[in-house]
Design a protein with these regions (language model features):
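Start-transfer (signal-anchor) and selected internal transmembrane alpha helices
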Residues: 1-77
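Hydrophobic, membrane-inserted alpha-helices
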Residues: 9-16, 123-131, 147-151, 171-176
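Hydrophobic core segments of transmembrane alpha-helices in multi-pass, intramembrane catalytic enzymes
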Residues: 31-38, 143, 147, 187-189
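Aromatic- and kink-enriched transmembrane "portal" helix at the membrane-lumen/periplasm boundary
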Residues: 127-128, 167-189
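Transmembrane-helix motifs of polytopic, lipid-linked glycan transferases
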Residues: 128, 139-163
Length: 189
């Protein structure tokens, strides 16, 4: 059941970016290959965990994965965020940024709307968690920092890097993760 849920949560939603970015003539083969590859990956991890865990149980892999997350977000987030000048893209990041900036000014920002005209939706608790990223203008690091924290907690409780690295790799193998991460969505965080 866990494998099925993992597959449904991480890989089936990844059909969306494939349909958005692949040319129509490659769509069927692209989606099929991606979903098949995800199934094979889950199968290998569950059936060959001992072998895979020996390889993954390294701090250097953990650091490499986190650095990759940080670099991709630092490079891609400004590009995705710039789409708002054309009234395109996602305003999910703006929700937290607007509330955070309101908190920093000592004001409520819940009467404001995003550039797409959507009402502000995150609660004040969630806005407080993201406040350091808003205050220091490093919002692109919100998702990588959240995954870093999740990975460190897994490492602490499991006592090994293999499970923390697997946690990161599962997220990073999902196309929908990358799409929502680089637009500043807080869904993963």
């Amino acid at each position: 059941l866990n494998k099925i849920l993992l597959y449904l949560m991480l890989y089936v939603p990844s059909i969306r970016p494939l349909t958005k970015y692949l040319p129509e003539q490659l769509l069927l083969i692209g989606v099929s290959l991606y979903l098949f590859g995800a199934l094979v990956g889950i199968y290998l991890v569950t059936q060959r965990w001992y072998m895979i865990s020996r390889f993954l149980n390294r701090m250097s892999i953990f650091v490499m994965l986190i650095v990759t997350l940080i670099l991709v977000n630092l490079i891609m987030y400004p590009r995705a965020d710039a789409l708002k000048t054309e009234l395109r893209g996602s305003d999910q990041d703006d929700n937290l940024i607007i509330v955070g900036e309101g908190i920093l000014r000592g004001e409520s920002a819940y009467h404001l709307k995003t550039y797409l005209g959507n009402p502000i939706s995150p609660g004040p608790g969630w806005a407080l968690i993201s406040l350091p990223f808003v205050a220091f203008h490093i919002y692109a690091l919100f998702t990588p920092a959240s995954l870093l924290l999740g990975g460190l907690i897994i490492k602490q409780y499991s006592g090994e890097y293999a499970k923390a690295n697997l946690f990161l790799l599962f997220w990073m193998s999902s196309l929908i993760f990358w799409e929502i991460s680089v637009v500043g969505s807080d869904m993963v965080a």
